Amino acid sequence: MVAREMFVAGECFVRLRPRRAEDGLLVPLQMQLLQSEMLPFDKTGLTVDGNVVRCGIEFDLIGRRVAYHFRRSHPGDSTDQRVAVPETVRVPAEDVLHIYRPIDAGQIRGLPHVAPAMVRLFLLDQYDDAELDRKKTAAMFAGFITKTAPEDPMMGEGVADLDGAAMASLEPGTMQVLLPGEDVKFSSPADVGGGYEAFQYRTLLAVSASLGLPYHLVTGDVRQANYSSLRAELVEFRRRVQQLQHGVIAHQLCRPVWRRWLEIAQLAGRLDLSDPAAARMVQWIPPRWDWVDPLKDIQAQVLAMEAGITSRRKVVEATGYDVEEVDRENAADAART
């Protein structure tokens, strides 16, 4: 959820909230996820003690974050009728985790990852709607009956519309008898031909590039892909994802939460740690990646281990498991046999 919020809104705030012992929690700690809208961009100014508030974030004289000024309710929530409470509440910075990926020096708020593609997606949506309206309009006219003589037929014309033009309905199995001088011309609306699909492909290709995602993952279209192209795109895509996993999610979210959880659990008497500093030294293993051709990848990993390029620990951790746990399971399986 944090990663999705960061991708859509550019950032996510996690408030660490210690609880009372009577709340019945095993470890009296909860996390509250706050959207980007909860921290107002227009909250700026000076505090009484001389700190500076920029975009809802309070900085001290040396530029260190000391507090966040959150709204008490979401600005788009029309069901919250609390109007007597202050607009914002000050939360100390040690209780707030600001999850975002900075791309500029001095950046203090997150930028949505989908922002570079929004204009193209909006124009593509308008183009699709216009093409759908054009096809709907063209499908309403089955054909036209033309006459060479201006006189009315003996049996009268069809029911006229508001402009005075006669109209005739067309039903399945109808055999229309025409009078002398009348002719039927079927509607042949202009078509965009092959330009529609080519335009969509180029636009979605640019959208995929701006999002940093492979084209086939954005559209689900693998008609023009092969094994080599899919693997090349996936390798680059997974490199970007791993940067976010280890450089943003693990560093900004997992490590602070783990440290606070250990602290609260030890204070609550749930853990007896002889070396708290060693307990904080953990390794974060993200979920594994599934390859297009697992056989070739496993063979390549085996060759890399035999050549001494990589270790078995790294190969096992790349699958999302802990090497010690795998060794214990293998030993248990061997003991059963």
Regions found by a protein language model. Give the residues of each.
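Structured, mid-chain assembly/scaffold modules that mediate subunit interfaces
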Residues: 1-99
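Acidic/polar, glycine-anchored loop/turn motif associated with catalytic or activation segments
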Residues: 63, 207, 315
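Short coil/turn segments at secondary-structure boundaries
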Residues: 2, 16-18, 134-140, 218-222, ...
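Surface-exposed loop-to-helix/strand elements on domain peripheries
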Residues: 176-295, 324
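Hydrophobic side-chain positions on well-ordered alpha-helices
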Residues: 5-6, 265, 304-305
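Charged substrate- and nucleic-acid-binding regions of tRNA-handling and nucleotidyl-transfer enzymes
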Residues: 291-337
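Short, conserved catalytic/metal-binding motifs centered on acidic residues
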Residues: 14, 124, 253
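Extended, charged amphipathic alpha-helical segments
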Residues: 93-233
